[in-house]
Each structure stands twice: as structure tokens, then as C-alpha cells.
Amino acid sequence: QAYSNTYKPLDELKALYEEALSVPGVVGIVIGTRPDCVDEAKLDYLAGLSERCHVVVEYGIESVYDDTLRRINRGHTFECSRRAVEMTAERKIHVGAHFILGLPGESRDNMLRSVGEINSLPLDTVKFHQLQVFRGTMMERDYMAHPDRYTFFECDEYIDFFCEILMRLRPDIVVERFAGEAPPRFHIGPSWGLIRNNTLITMLEKRLEERDVWQGCMYEG
């Protein structure tokens, strides 16, 4: 899933996908890519492929706000993402998306309101991730110059906030991931202490039970 796995001519992509599917025991492929790296021909091929094996296309959308996408130099708009997701779903291909919570310039209210746009997309699955600013990157330099633009979450604080996201999220969208933690030596900001994913899930489940809330309980569809 790393990198943009539709960023080649279709003939070369076909050879790569078929090579992966020829490995014994492989029953499908998950293709991570950018929304500006697909077209009708590539999706038509993947639609045919999905008739004989499991195919998932997962788009790195990251934000629904064009100002944010420009600020982090994504090189595409949210409308581009919407078109890619819709073209994929129209072909009955399983489609997922990835979003980052806490991107520079986005308030918590912005993040909560973005769930409405996410709900409007024909997504099967979604992955969320709290912002982590890696050392030695342009974003680290921007953070040093403009720290007020950034929202970092402490672990317990993020669990509470993600409950709010989940309450507003369309109930049929499967959440495949809601957080992650790189080793502290690689990023700046709060460290969650290399907490295990299953521990995060347990914390979220407990908080949902304590608050007596669930995915979609505030969804207005």
C-alpha cells in the first residue's frame, strides 16, 4: 500500500498486479494511491479484476478542505478526491479513504464538520490517523515557524475526540484504523509511548461504553 500504486502506464500496472496475484495464497490486492493517479481506463481494468479476486482501492484524501490541501502541498483538491471515489464506487470496486486529524490550520470544529463531507462519499472503509510531524521534513520547519497552526493530541484527549468523530460518522462505513504511533525518535510533539494498537482499541471501546455512545448515533443522513 505504500506510495502511489496506480502511478504507471496501465500495461505496467497490469504486469505488477498479476505478478502479485500469482503468488500462492494471495486472494486479492489492496491498492493504496492518490486520487489524482487514477483514470477511467485503470478503474475499468480494476473492475474486471475485482470479478475474479478481492480488490480494494484506498485513496489518501487526508482532508476535505482545499485550503489545508494547498497548505500541506498535496497537489490535488477535495473535488478530485470525490470524483475518484465516485468513479471507483460506480464500478462496484471496494473503496476506502485515509484522513489525518489535526492538520495545520484545522480547528477541532473544522475536523468535526468534515465528517459530513466524508459521509457524503460512497466509501466502504475509512482510516483515520492523528497528525504526527516527522523530523527533517518541510512540515517540521513550518511547525517551528507557525506552531499556532497545529493541533497535537495527547492520547487520552484523542480517544475522547475520536468518540465525537465516530458519533457523527455514517454507521455503515467500516473504520479500519483510527490512530497510529511512530517511534518518538522520528517525530516531534506528544509521544504516546509506543502504545499498542489493541490497547488503543480497548481504550476507545471503554470510553464509548462510559459515554453510552456509538458510531452514527449523531449521524444525520
Predicted regions and their residues:
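Core AdoMet radical
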Residues: 1-10, 23-38, 53-81, 127-129
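Alpha-helix N-cap and loop-to-helix initiation/capping positions
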Residues: 8, 12, 72-80, 106-113, ...
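Short, electropositive alpha-helical surface patch
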Residues: 11-20, 47, 107-124, 181-204
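Structural motif corresponding to alpha-helix initiation and N-cap regions
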Residues: 14, 39-43, 159
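N-terminal/domain-start segments enriched in small and hydrophobic, helix-friendly residues
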Residues: 17-29, 33-35, 115-154
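Acidic (Asp/Glu)-rich catalytic clusters
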Residues: 17-24, 44-54, 86-90
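Conserved C-terminal portion of the radical SAM core fold
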Residues: 79-139, 156-181
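Auxiliary Fe-S-binding modules of radical SAM enzymes
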Residues: 125, 132-221
